Amino acid sequence: MTTFSPREIVSELDRFIIGQKDAKRAVAIALRNRWRRQQLEGQMREEVMPKNILMIGPTGVGKTEISRRLARLAGAPFVKVEATKFTEVGYVGRDVEQIIRDLVEIAIGLVREKMREDVKARAHINAEERVLEALVGKTASPATRDSFRKKLRDGELDDKEIEIEVADTGNGGMPGFEIPGMPGANIGVLNINDMLSKAMGGKKTKSRKTTVKESYDLLVSDESDKLLDQDEVVRRALDATENDGIVFLDEIDKIAARSDISGGPSREGVQRDLLPLVEGTTVATKYGPVKTDHILFIASGAFHVSKPSDLLPELQGRLPIRVELRALEKQDFVRILTETEASLIKQYIALMKTEGVDLTFTDDAIDSLAGIAVDLNDSVENIGARRLQTVMERVLDEISYDAPDRNGTSVTIDAAYVEKHVGDLSRNTDLSRFIL
């Protein structure tokens, strides 16, 4: 769990997302409150519940991007799911408890990665011994082993091919399966391979032919897993899930829309299934029970057709912090193209550089691109910042196609170039509906 202050979190998000100050502040405070709660003792720590967030705003203004960047910042188990993927219990499809099972799997991966770092030095020594064994055999004399060890460390044997035994992480063509509509079965996903490997005593291994250099990553990973206490990995992962876990529920407005159609899986039913999860319940996973009382839920939706008040009143009450994200204006588009750390313009310049083409954009070209994107959003459909990708692709279509033949040249994109390639299309509403 990271210990950034709210100001530092907002500053980090500012590098990638333009505007939306209120939303950034809300998620920054929520993330910091996780850390504050960890500093409390006993009963008070149990009583402090996370303040779940509902982000409301049109498409393409940064809701999903905020969640994506927050995941990297948090250093905590984080899962992003679309609310529309789930069905009411009793219908074939994913039930909402799968969210928590996915969160536990992510936590297991995070904890294992962190614990691998602690045993990396020891794992590297063991990996070196296994490479030597593959090179000279088990019966080689100490002098031979030392001679090969020196060559190995000097990199003289990097390209030599060896055969090694590593753990078989695949499922061997035997798929796991879910039991539809049976969340009470308390097993989540049954994996036949897991059962067979336990019955036969230990993990399966497989032979792989690889070069000495490439074998190190495989063997260090394999040896690290052998040195890890798997029970401790699970214990830490369950603790991280319960106390630091964050669930981002996207497209929540799609299950809020009222429907008169009966007989099918109810959207209201999905909301009702979400209620205990958000309020606090115990979910059975294959690693053990997980309490959801202190998991932070961030829900988001455009609410074009429905409105937040269409959600079940009980669910509204579980999302006490409301944040509205505003629609983007022309100046925001200009800033998105120029100020963000990995802006579209920087991406295209870097991509063209790989072909030996030196691409530059003038200020009036950037202004023109932003203006066209805003006009199209107003006249066709408002898809927010995503419109910039469509416009940029159209403008650079010719250059991208001819780039291999332009090696060593410089290309300047100005307002006239932008106008020539998308100006007419953007003004023709009928055409732009299909092309832009």
UniProtKB/Swiss-Prot annotation:
Cross-referenced NCBIfam families: hslU (TIGR00390), PRK05201.1 (NF003544)
Summary of the function given for this chain in its UniProt record: ATPase subunit of a proteasome-like degradation complex; this subunit has chaperone activity. The binding of ATP and its subsequent hydrolysis by HslU are essential for unfolding of protein substrates subsequently hydrolyzed by HslV. HslU recognizes the N-terminal part of its protein substrates and unfolds these before they are guided to HslV for hydrolysis.
Family: Belongs to the ClpX chaperone family. HslU subfamily.
Gene3D superfamilies: 1.10.8.60, P-loop containing nucleotide triphosphate hydrolases
Primary location group: cytoplasm
Listed name of the protein: ATP-dependent protease ATPase subunit HslU
Originating organism: Mesorhizobium japonicum (strain LMG 29417 / CECT 9101 / MAFF 303099)
GO annotation terms (biological process): protein unfolding; proteolysis involved in protein catabolic process
InterPro entries: AAA+_ATPase, ATP-dep_Clp_protease_ClpX, ATPase_AAA_core, Clp_ATPase_C, HslU, P-loop_NTPase
Binding site for ATP: I18, G60, V61, G62, K63, T64, E65, D250, E314, R386
